[in-house]
Amino acid sequence: MQARDCSFYLGGLSCGGYRGYFQEFADEFSVPVLIEGGFSSGAGKILEAVRQQLAQSGQCVETICCSAYAGKLDALGCKGVCFVNATSPHAPKAVLPTAVEQVLSLYDAYDQKMLVSKREELTAWTESGDRAFRRAARYLTAAASLLRENEQAVLTCTDLSKAEQLGRALAKRYLRENGANGRVHMRLLSAVTSDGIRFLPDVIRPIETLVVLEDEYGASADCILRVLQQHATERGLDIIACPCPVRPKHLEHLIFPQLSTAFVTANRYHSEYPGNPRRIHCTRVSEKSGLRVRRARLRFNRKMAEELMAQVFGALTEAGEAQKAVDAIYSAAEIPEQIEKLCLRAKELSSLDAGL
């Protein structure tokens, strides 16, 4: 899919719990390599070894960032091969192991006696992390409910037929026929993390045509983007579809690599975009007098949602600390020779193509 190096997320906390697209990512590649049986430390070393080899050989690499740990990888892809940390909660499945999916197992790469001796500590940290993550999910679900109430309030004074008409006009202007069968690639440009809602702008920077939909409440942008996606599919274009990390049923961004064109949503969590993009204020399809009447309620809900989001970030920090403690124990129990063998095997697999 990638014509240049690019970075995305593939999963993270959303309303209702964890939501990921790792299976969809693995299914895009001829040779999915699943790294099983360990925590982020072991899988991270394998992924980094492969990334460095591919970068040194001048290959374009798509890296998948970890939403739980800044600076760590969850997966990467290059040509027909991808590598995925397949531990929970990612857990893509090997349907035809060895025939299709290649599996790298970390189970034998740890000192069993050491881990058994740390069983109680590992259990305590794991349970603590799970409790914190569930608490974060509850806070996020409550915040999403308030944001949804705002969206519904704005929808009552929004003319969706005008939004659809705008989507069709944008499609006519920016989306040309490709004459092929396009594919939809599910990715995330932002994720809910312990540091807030993080946004990855690198994939947007080289885009030649950027259209920003200013939509604070998410009432119109999703409708416009759905129309654009439908027209792009009919015209055979490849699509990178980026849902909202908080409310996965809502589209936030669409990227069309073949056209170097993107339509993105701007709100308080990601409002700054590079260059001088065209900006469309979605209030143009809303009745402004209706928005003014509801302004006080909208502000109150938004303020309460922000307070709940602060609790989300705090709970995710607790969950992250617990996970780091577990990772540290597993990292100390690694058998270096076994990890090195897995890294070498991963490098061999990175040279496979669709014909093998």
Name the predicted role of every residue range:
Residues 1-24, 161-202:
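N-terminal pre-Walker A segment at the start of P-loop NTPase domains
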Residues 2-18, 25, 30, 51-114, ...:
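Conserved nucleotide-sensing/catalytic segment adjacent to the nucleotide-binding pocket
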Residues 31, 176-182, 209, 347, ...:
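N-terminal low-complexity, Ser/Thr/acidic repeat segments characteristic of secreted
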Residues 31-52, 197-198, 206-232:
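Glycine-rich phosphate-binding P-loop
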Residues 35-36, 46, 62-63, 96, ...:
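A cross-family "folded-core" feature that marks the main globular domain of proteins
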Residues 97, 101-137:
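Internal, well-ordered alpha/beta segment that forms a basic, Gly-enriched binding/recognition surface
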Residues 121-178, 297-345, 349:
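An accessory alpha-helical subdomain
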